Structures are given as C-alpha cells and as structure tokens.
C-alpha cells in the first residue's frame, strides 16, 4: 500500500468513527461549534490572509486567470461573509431526528420514519476556499462527518481554515475528525477518496465539467452531482411579453457564470416578431452575443447563425442561443434533446400550458414566469446549499441540510408477534 493510500485509509477510518459520534451530537453542541468557528475566522483574519497570500502568489506565478484569482482571494469581505454564513447555518433548524409519516397499523404497531445523517461525505472542489467553510458547516449541522479535498491552488488557505473548523469542534466537545481537510496535492488522494466505499457514503463534487466527468467515471462511491447547467427559457404564445422581456434578460445577464444562467431562449413563432427585436437590442447593448436559427435571425439582425453545438453548449458567458418554435411540444422536445436536466422555465399566462411544462419537462427545477437564475438554495428557502444535483436518486435540485440526510424506518410496539 502506497503512502497516499495509507494516509487516505487513516482519514477514512477516523471519519467513520467520528460519524458515529456525530449521530449522538446535540443540536446545541453543533451550533456551539459553528458559532466558535465564526468568531475564530474573524479573530484569525490576519493568519488566514497570510496563508491565502501564499496561494495567490503561487497561482499568479502560474498564470491563473483573473476570474479564478478573484475566487481564490480571501478579502476582508469574503472572510466576513464566511463568518456570517456560519452564523446563518447555526440558526437553521436541525434536520436530524425529526419523525415523519407516522401511522398505526391494525395490530397497534406504530410505524414512522426518522431523518438521520448520510454518514461520511467527501467533498471535492476547486479554487474557492470559502467552500471549505460552507461544506464543513452544512455537513456538521446535518450530523455528518466530512472529508474535504480542495483544489491544489488553495492548499494553504484550506489547511488554515481546516484548523479553525477543528478548533471549533473541539471547543464544543465534538470529534475533530468530523471535519478533515486533505493536506496533500497528490491527485491519487482523490482517486482513493472516491473508491473508499467502506468509509465514505457519498461524494459531492463542486467544480467544472471536466472534474465531475472524471469523477463520475472513476468513483465507486455514489455522487451527488450535476455536469452542467444548459438552462432554457421558453416564451409561450400566451406569454405576457413585458414579463417575458424582463425574465429572459434577467435569466441571461444576472450572472453569466452561474449554473442557472439561461443559455438558450426558445420563442413561440406567434410572439417572436413582437418580442425579439427589443429584447435582442437590450441584450446586445449589455454585451451579449446572439446566435439564432434562421427564423430568429429575421428579428436579430446582428445575430450569428446557430448550429447544433450552440444548442448543446453551457456558455457561462455573454452568449445566448435563440430558437423560434411553433408549439410547446417543439420547445419541450428541444429541451429534452439538448438540456442538461438542471433548470428550465416557461413564460405563459396559459394555466394548462404551465402545468404541462412543469409536469413533462424532466429537469431538477421547472419554473413558471420566473428566470432560471433563481436556481439557488438561498432563494428556495433552504438557507444554504452544498450544490445542485441533477440526479434522479436521493437529492435533486439545490441540496441543503435535508439533502444531506436520509430516512430510516422506526417501529414501536408492545410485544406484538407476527402471525
């Protein structure tokens, strides 16, 4: 066994032991740990920024692009937001131990379901060190142990944050191994983590399509994931066009880089001439490049012809594909063929069309008269999220505290025996 395998095996064993202790942890102890972490992050700001400066300097020397450097940097504001996030998670209801679906059988046996932690969660993520705190806090609050493996470019930052997390756990009388940060940049550690089925119950990858595709191929541990966010807005024949203009504009321009950004606009032929000229001009003035089908380009004079690659692409930038369709069925067929199952929306005042769209579009979130950029756990009232899942099993859509738990059956009787 290699040194990396030995190291990861030890991490996994400690996490599994800690997960059993976390099953017994009280809500008060978990909240105490979270609040201690929030105080320590602010108190140790200088130490955190010194560690982060090493990562930023190395990343800049290696030519990391400006947007990624910005994500990597722990500014005063980002540190304050991490502390505030910890306090917000501490204030959320504890999902553990809640009882649902209670019934009494004819023989008097009481049957119910209890919400319990998943166990040990591995989180694999790229350059943003704030994910270390977000992931640790959500896993802790939901009663799970977690193993965190951040990007190599943020190693010093993540290790420093990990020390703060473990000090908070210790202060609350919880096992420090409930949150462990992998302190090696060796990629073999990731390969081992996603195959340790005896110690890890689920993996949550946070990163680009390349990372998630690779993990999906290599993992033996189940993944909660989404590959990409190729999101659509369909403007129906019965749409309020003022709403449609604002929804489509917001869905594209709110933030280009989020996974809920609209990448393709589908417009019913009956309203295309009235919607597209003004909307196209507004988008162009905002710096958005338009790529359309031949029919759409009639009303988008500066647009470029779209091809199949455009329908399939998650741009994560100021580019929008536009297609004119003749029916709601054609719109839903397009989404079924080219969509990623993330988030899709219809703009319509027709109730039956709205109901059909929500019933038949097979995505993790389906909206009526809302922009797709609402795909976010905070917007759903979840308080926080570990990510967005397009899986059909277990969690789907934004994954908050409840998504990091599962249900077990609990039965109570008075000595009944089965006949």
Swiss-Prot record:
It is found in: Cytoplasm. It catalyses: L-glutamate 5-semialdehyde + phosphate + NADP(+) = L-glutamyl 5-phosphate + NADPH + H(+). InterPro entries: Ald_DH/histidinol_DH, Ald_DH_C, Ald_DH_N, Aldehyde_DH_dom, G-glutamylP_reductase_CS, Glu-5-SA_DH, GPR_dom. Pathway: Amino-acid biosynthesis; L-proline biosynthesis; L-glutamate 5-semialdehyde from L-glutamate: step 2/2. Its EC number is 1.2.1.41. GO terms for molecular function: glutamate-5-semialdehyde dehydrogenase activity; NADP binding. GO terms for cellular component: cytoplasm. Keywords: Amino-acid biosynthesis, Cytoplasm, NADP, Oxidoreductase, Proline biosynthesis. SUPFAM superfamilies: ALDH-like. It holds the Pfam family Aldedh. It is an enzyme of class 1 (oxidoreductase). Its main location: cytoplasm. GO terms for biological process: L-proline biosynthetic process. Catalyzes the NADPH-dependent reduction of L-glutamate 5-phosphate into L-glutamate 5-semialdehyde and phosphate. The product spontaneously undergoes cyclization to form 1-pyrroline-5-carboxylate. Belongs to the gamma-glutamyl phosphate reductase family. NCBIfam families: PRK00197.1, proA. This is Gamma-glutamyl phosphate reductase. The lineage of its organism: Bacteria, Pseudomonadati, Pseudomonadota, Betaproteobacteria, Burkholderiales. The gene is proA.
């Amino acid at each position: 066994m290699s040194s990396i395998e030995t190291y990861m095996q030890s991490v996994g064993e400690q996490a599994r032991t800690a997960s059993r202790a976390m099953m017994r942890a009280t809500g008060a102890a978990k909240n105490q740990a979270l609040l201690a972490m929030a105080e320590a992050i602010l108190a140790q700001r200088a130490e955190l920024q010194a560690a982060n400066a090493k990562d930023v300097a190395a990343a800049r020397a290696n030519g990391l692009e400006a947007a990624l450097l910005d994500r990597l940097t722990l500014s005063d504001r980002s540190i304050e937001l991490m502390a505030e996030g910890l306090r917000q998670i501490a204030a959320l209801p504890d999902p553990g131990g809640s009882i649902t679906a209670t019934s009494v059988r004819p023989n008097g046996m009481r049957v119910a379901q209890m919400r319990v932690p998943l166990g040990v969660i591995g989180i694999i993520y790229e350059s943003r060190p704030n994910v270390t705190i977000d992931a640790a806090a959500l896993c802790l609050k939901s009663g799970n142990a977690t193993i965190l493996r951040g990007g190599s470019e943020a190693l010093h930052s993540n290790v420093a944050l990990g020390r703060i997390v473990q000090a908070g756990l210790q202060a609350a009388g919880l096992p420090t191994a409930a949150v462990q940060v992998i302190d090696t940049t060796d990629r073999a550690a990731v390969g081992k983590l996603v195959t340790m089925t005896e110690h890890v119950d689920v993996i949550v990858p946070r990163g680009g399509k390349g990372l998630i595709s690779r993990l999906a191929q290599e993992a033996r541990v189940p993944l909660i994931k989404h590959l990409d966010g190729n999101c659509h807005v369909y403007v129906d024949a019965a749409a309020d066009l003022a709403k449609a203009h604002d929804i489509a504009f917001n869905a594209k321009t709110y933030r280009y880089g989020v996974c809920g950004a609209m990448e393709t606009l589908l417009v019913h032929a009956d309203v295309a001439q009235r919607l597209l000229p003004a909307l196209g001009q507004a988008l162009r003035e905002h710096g958005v490049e338009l790529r359309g089908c031949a029919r759409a380009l009639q009303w988008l004079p500066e647009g470029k012809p779209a091809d199949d690659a455009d329908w399939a692409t998650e741009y994560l930038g100021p580019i929008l594909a536009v297609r004119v369709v003749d029916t709601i069925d054609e719109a839903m067929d397009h989404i079924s063929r080219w969509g990623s199952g993330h988030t899709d929306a219809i703009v319509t005042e027709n109730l039956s069309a709205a109901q059909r769209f929500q019933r038949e579009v097979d995505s993790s979130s389906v909206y009526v008269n809302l922009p797709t950029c609402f795909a976010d756990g905070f917007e759903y009232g979840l308080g926080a999220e570990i990510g967005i899942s397009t899986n059909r099993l277990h969690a789907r859509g934004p994954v908050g505290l409840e998504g990091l738990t599962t249900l077990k059956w609990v039965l109570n009787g008075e000595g009944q025996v089965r006949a």
